[in-house]
A protein has these predicted regions:
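Fe(II)/2-oxoglutarate oxygenase catalytic core
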Residues: 1-180, 184-210
Length: 210
């Protein structure tokens, strides 16, 4: 699917106080080792811990800590921006619900390699991920590395080089910035070289495209 806009952003959209409150609240919770879909994102590691091979497999793709949040005051802040981006970017995807929000902590050398958030196999409720959102909780001056990068992949590989289809989302470095994008768009978080990067991620689900 070729798109006119592969993401839509809102610079410094959320108040710094809100960002600080989310960080404080999330850090008061017990964080978890971030998983990938291959081993089950909702897997209970207390009852079914990863084998050494599984852990190594996850870390080839992803290395970070997360906290799941299901708080109305957070949804109230972020959802209007998702609706606005969906309309202004021209996607006009029909979506019904937001999954639990993921607070993510990237420390030194932590990352999330290339992936997309959606697949054609619906959840049990019959829905798929349609729109993804990331909120920058820490200012870009507070850490180094950790760039959110997109691969639009709308190119003929024999005609174009990598520099023409990779895009670093520098627009969202200021604290409180929000970026929304279709969940099938490939993206990654590059390794953090200094400091800690905190972000808030949410997925907005709807019934499969027809």
């Amino acid at each position: 699917m070729n798109l006119s806009n592969y993401y839509w952003y809102f610079k410094s959209a959320l108040r710094p106080k809100f960002c600080d409150e989310v960080i404080k609240y999330a850090l008061s919770k017990r964080e978890k080792f971030a998983l990938t879909g291959g081993v089950g994102r909702q897997r209970d590691l207390n009852n079914k811990p990863l084998s050494r091979k599984e852990e190594e497999g996850v870390k080839q793709k992803r290395n970070s800590s997360i906290v799941w949040l299901d708080e109305g005051w957070i949804y109230k802040e972020i959802q209007p921006y998702v609706h606005e981006a969906n309309e202004r970017a021209g996607w006009n995807f029909n979506w019904e619900r937001t999954e639990n929000v993921q607070f993510t902590k990237y420390k030194l050398n932590q990352y999330y390699d290339w992936h997309c958030d959606s697949c054609d196999n619906p959840y049990k409720n019959g829905m798929i991920r349609k729109l993804s959102m990331t909120c920058q909780l820490t200012d870009g001056s507070e850490y180094e590395g950790g760039e959110l990068e997109f691969d639009f992949r709308n190119y003929d590989p024999h005609m174009r080089d990598e520099s023409q289809h990779l895009n670093k989302a520098k627009e969202i470095l200021p604290k409180g910035s929000i970026i929304v994008f279709p969940s099938h768009v490939w993206h990654r978080v590059k390794p953090v070289r200094k400091g800690v990067r905190y972000s808030l991620v949410a997925w907005h689900n709807g019934y499969p495209f027809k």
